[in-house]
Curated annotation (Swiss-Prot):
The gene is aspS. The keyword Translocase does not apply. It comes from Pediococcus pentosaceus (strain ATCC 25745 / CCUG 21536 / LMG 10740 / 183-1w). It is found in: Cytoplasm. Its main location: cytoplasm. This is Aspartate--tRNA ligase.
Amino acid sequence: MKRTTYAGLVNEQYTGQTVTLKGWVQKRRDLGQLIFIDLRDREGIVQLVFSSEFSADALKIADQLRNEYVLEITGIVKQRKEKDVNPKMKTGQIEVEVQQAKILNSAKTPPFDIEDGVSASDELKMKYRYLDLRRPEMLKGLKIRNRITQAVHSYLDEQGFLDIETPDLTKSTPEGARDYLVPSRVYPGHFYALPQSPQLFKQLLMGAGIDRYYQLARCFRDEDLRGDRQPEFTQIDLETSFLTAEEIQDITEGLIARVMKDTLDIDVKLPFDRISWKESMDRFGTDQPDVRFGMELKDISSIVADSEFKVFSGAVANGGVVKAIAVPDGANNLSRKDIDKLGKYVERFGAKGLAWLKITDDGFSGPVAKFFNAETEKQIMEQTGAQVGDLLLFAADRAKVVGDTLGYLRVELAKRFDMIDEDQFAFLWVVDWPLFDYDEGDQRWVAAHHPFTMPNEEDVHYLDEGEDPHQAHAQSYDIILNGLELGGGSIRINTRELQEKMLKALGFSLESANDQFGYLLTALDYGFPPHGGLAIGLDRFARLLVKRDNIRDVIAFPKNSKASEPMTEAPTMVSEEQLAELSLDIDVRKPED
């Protein structure tokens, strides 16, 4: 029989109506001549009542049912008695008296309970992912994701964007992470790469006169995984011609506002706040600031430059900085042992220690209090905004070490003391980025975003011969949500001359630039318009909207932290015949100790 509606959508408006429902048995309660079944589908759960009073045949069927059996029923919707109403259920006002029932399929006992809050391991749930996805909290993630994509399509279509697919088999180019490579059977020894982003193709579309492009782009990066990363992911990718950075940001804000309204019925305030990269680093110690709470970093370098406390004065003398955060009521809530643990933890950022002071009615208290006179105390209090009962935490070192240290402590302590409004969605633009970033691991300068980013107009000369390109700032912008990068973009370079200068500044020879990006450089000779764009991480956006810790929870079939997939056991070895077709020999090397 044809299904009337979803089980989870049956409500009081259906009272007295005959409905046909199909779904899974969530729970069975047998009272002899009365059996209650909770029937579950993707929209929720409804209670079924089986009784010989309604149908003896249906009662016999109910006696056979077990959890996760697939069931079809037809019955009459009835109001529950007042004492039986379940306010915790969306359908708790009604129940369905079953007149006909049919088992569509039986089921083995699942390896874990199909319910929220189940204690099964992540690995087990991923092995039986199709069962895990039956749980309401997992379905919620996929539904939110779907609403986001529907809002994206609707809004960008209204704004005149064309949905255009770009290739998934393309050329390997250095964009930061390792490429996933695909061997070519037709061209032995040659490889395609799965795209890390559609960056160059969407720029070429602007050169083709498309004007406004978007797609929900699948991207692939062979990198170490963490909570907000997967080897394959989806981004909301867009590119426009003839627009300024501010105009692109306005379109993006409209897109985000539509998504928030259509998914969570939240009206976000427009326009979003904007701060420069430098201001973000100065105030928050990070380029991804969480602005839902205060406790900002305060620079006291000038106050302590001549201090008798040599850790502070020495740091300033060596070109470093001294900054502090004031932890509200921290003097009462953090013990010496707690502070020592924090000091030990921040050593990973290069910090050599953590100085601290408690603010009492009598002034500063703590190991370094003796180094500060009354006037210095007053200046530090004024600069940090500290009050009696607060705890001051200090870091003195190079600017990056200080920012990393106090930036981490700021967020960690805000979480510990419940200073963050978890119901707030705080969007922020971080703009005016450096064009280059120094990679301390590789000991070289790299593009802060990517090699195709346009410098600020007044900084273009820094790419000329004899100038210092690392002084340049970029026409780039990141959109931050609750302390995480939601997406980012820039105005792109649109002339060959400037693009070649940029690549040269990154260490590309003319030959290597043409080898890697020759098709783009050639295209730039043919009248490219001013253009720019942005990409937003769809998986991360969905994760933040459903308030989950890992993007796996909003991806139907994700990889685990080892980049494998327990259900299909991918990746796997392939046959010698397949390798021979690809002209490949495999030499599996043991990992280095």
